[in-house]
Curated annotation (Swiss-Prot):
Organism name: Cryptococcus neoformans var. grubii serotype A (strain H99 / ATCC 208821 / CBS 10515 / FGSC 9487)
CDD domains listed in its UniProt record: SANT
InterPro entries on file: DMTF1_DNA-bind_reg (IPR051651), Homeodomain-like_sf (IPR009057), Myb_dom (IPR017930), SANT/Myb (IPR001005), SANT_dom (IPR017884)
Portion annotated as DNA-binding: 410-432
Pfam families noted in UniProt: Myb_DNA-binding (PF00249)
Annotated protein name in UniProt: DNA-binding protein LIV4
Length: 625
């Protein structure tokens, strides 16, 4: 101890420090600091007294609000009292709305911070009083708004629309937390935003709050039709309900929905009928709506829309090619990327919206064609596996082995055979199935009769399914004819015992049985050829590729498509044997063929006149109709 004391004395002498004086000074500083008073808890009597004071202030505010409303509308004072006496629940409803008013997450966090700071400073009681006064101010404003609406309705004044009724805002105080934004550079050179809270100021007294504005300032009156008292009260009540449940869609207009499927379909069809009165609107809808084949056929059958069918014309092919080229240039795509986009299925694409917009642009280039028909045509046009010509026996064997390994998985089968999915499916189902039991060559009379009987039976079954068991008015209604395009030829082939393929059955029925059922007798080939050439000459196609045989047949319904095409092909073959004629353009070739058909028809008429004399003479091909 003596050594320690000597060391302290040496320090005092070396650094001239008075350790005793310093220690005594610290003791004096500690004595000067006053002790922090502790927070005193309120007694039950004090709490009860504060509650009674709050209730008294609330009653006083209500009375002041009622007096203010009476001063603003003295003429309707009796009406207001009667309305309030009849429906006193409106004031309770306003209080409930104020109590249940939704508070955002930011307001909740701000309120929690304020409570914590008030608690630390011993001002929790003051913040509760402030919050209670805020709610009272909102309630007073809402009551004034309701009273003004009732006054306007009772005095036959113009009632304002509900949308123009302003919601009283929650009064703000100086105790609310405000903030400033600061930007500081971080280590990467960018700026980082920080939110720094400001210091809280003490809450003001209750008397310093800004009083609620009168109800006349909250309701702008506009020149509308006069509303009844009941309508005004209901409008204000709906406004209060919308404030109470802001996210509810009860008061918002809803689209009419039907619980029953039939009514919903009729409503949709009615809207489509109205829209499709404009042909351009129908074309835009077909080019922008992805719709299934069944629904498309239903809409066409019910007469809601019509669309183009059959093969794509040469003009449509050119339009599609131009649309593809423009899309490729605009999006700066390579040919490989364009083909990949075309072959990508929408449901399997990573960016489905891009694929949908692409097909909308392409379908818009061929008005009247639905996307359902445009997609397979464009894919076949750009698919590297397409346009490979006739199937070889080696490809048929490879297709059979691939199908045995992957039944009905046409994507895998297509990659193995190196043909398109559609080609593989059609080749297998139409040609290779039951190939061992199939008959080739000419049809016998028994086969034709059996085919006609099978088609009639299948068509009758289809009609029975369509009417869903409904009774027919007359027995003749079940004997109407069925178009060859509406017959399920896969079922017909099975009913034939798989002795003929789907393609064989379809072609035989279309070219031989169907014209006979329509009562179309066979005409001389010379007259038929002249009629076909006359029709082609009048249509004035640019080239042979532009010919639409279904359009040619519109005025030649007496003949089948095969007969029309054969008449053109046979005459063309006879005239193009001359090298000079073979080098002519299509319009020049049609003129040569027409002249030859007229010459043949005149020769035939003169021969008939020698055999069967008649007073009538046909002089030109135009009179052959």
């Amino acid at each position: 101890m003596e050594g320690i004391e000597l060391g302290i004395q040496d320090l005092d002498r070396s650094y001239q420090i008075d350790t005793q004086a310093a220690s005594s000074g610290d003791e004096e500083d500690r004595q000067e600091v006053p002790e922090r008073p502790t927070k005193r808890k309120r007694t039950k009597e004090e709490k009860e007294r504060r509650r009674s004071e709050k209730r008294a202030r609330k009653e006083k505010r209500r009375s002041e609000t009622a007096q203010a409303a009476q001063i603003q509308a003295p003429q309707a004072q009796v009406g207001i009292e009667a309305e309030v006496a009849e429906a006193p629940a409106d004031y309770d409803e306003v209080e409930q709305v104020v109590e249940d008013a939704p508070v955002s997450e930011d307001n909740k966090k701000r309120k929690e911070k304020k409570h914590k700071k008030d608690k630390n400073k011993g001002k929790k009681g003051g913040s509760e009083e402030q919050e209670e006064e805020d709610r009272e101010a909102i309630a007073a404003s809402a009551v004034a708004t309701l009273a003004q609406a009732l006054v306007s309705s009772e005095s036959d004044q113009v009632a304002p629309p509900v949308d123009q009724i302003q919601t009283p805002a929650r009064p703000t105080t100086a105790t609310s937390t405000s903030a400033t934004w600061r930007t500081n550079p971080n280590q990467y050179g960018s700026t980082k935003v920080k939110k720094v809270p400001l210091e809280l100021s003490p809450p003001p007294a209750a008397s310093s709050l800004t009083p609620a504005p009168p109800a006349t300032q909250l309701i702008p009156v506009t020149p509308l039709t006069a509303a009844s008292a009941g309508a005004s009260s209901f409008a204000v009540r709906d406004k209060i309900n919308s404030l109470k449940h802001p996210k509810s869609s009860t008061n918002a207009p809803k689209a009419i929905r039907s619980t029953r499927k039939g009514e919903d379909t009729k409503e949709s069809d009615a809207q489509l009928r109205l829209r499709f009165k404009d042909p351009k609107a129908q074309e835009e809808w077909l080019a922008s709506t992805s719709i299934g084949k069944t629904e498309l056929l239903r809409l066409e059958k019910e007469g809601i829309l019509s669309y183009k069918k059959g093969k794509f014309t040469e003009d449509e092919k050119v339009s599609i090619k131009k649309a593809l080229e423009n899309y490729q240039k605009i999006h700066r795509m390579s040919s490989f990327d364009l083909v990949e986009l075309v072959m990508t299925k929408t449901l399997q694409a990573t960016d489905k919206e891009t694929v949908r917009e692409f097909w909308k642009d392409i379908a818009a280039s061929v008005p009247g064609r639905p996307i359902l028909n445009v997609q397979p045509f464009v894919r076949r046009m750009l698919d590297p596996k397409a346009h490979k010509g006739r199937w070889t026996s080696e490809e048929d064997e490879l297709l059979l082995r691939a199908y045995a390994q992957h039944p009905r998985e046409w994507t895998k089968i297509s990659s193995i055979v190196d043909r398109t999915e559609v080609d593989c499916r059609d080749r297998y189902l139409k040609e290779l199935v039951n190939r061992d039991t199939r008959t080739a060559g000419r049809w016998t009379k028994e086969e034709e009769d059996k085919l006609e009987e099978v088609v009639d039976r299948v068509a009758k079954g289809l009609r029975a399914e369509q009417v869903h068991g409904e009774e027919r008015e007359t027995p003749e209604e079940g004997t109407e004819l069925v178009e060859p395009s509406d017959v399920p030829w896969d079922i017909v082939s099975k009913e034939m015992g798989n002795t003929r393929s789907m393609t064989q059955c379809r072609i035989k029925y279309r070219d031989a049985i169907w014209p006979r059922k329509l009562g179309l007798g066979k005409d001389d080939h010379v007259g038929r050829t002249l009629k076909v050439l006359t029709r082609l000459k009048n249509l004035n196609y640019e080239s042979e590729k532009h010919i639409s045989w279904s359009q040619v047949r519109e005025t030649l319904e007496k003949y089948s498509l095969k007969e029309i095409r054969n008449s053109y092909s046979n005459l063309k073959k006879s005239v193009t044997s001359d090298p000079h004629v073979a080098s002519l353009t299509y319009p020049e070739l049609i003129k040569v063929m027409y002249d030859k058909a007229v010459m043949q028809r005149g020769r035939k008429v003169r021969a008939d006149q020698r055999d069967y004399p008649s007073k009538e003479t046909v002089e030109s091909g135009d009179e052959a109709y």
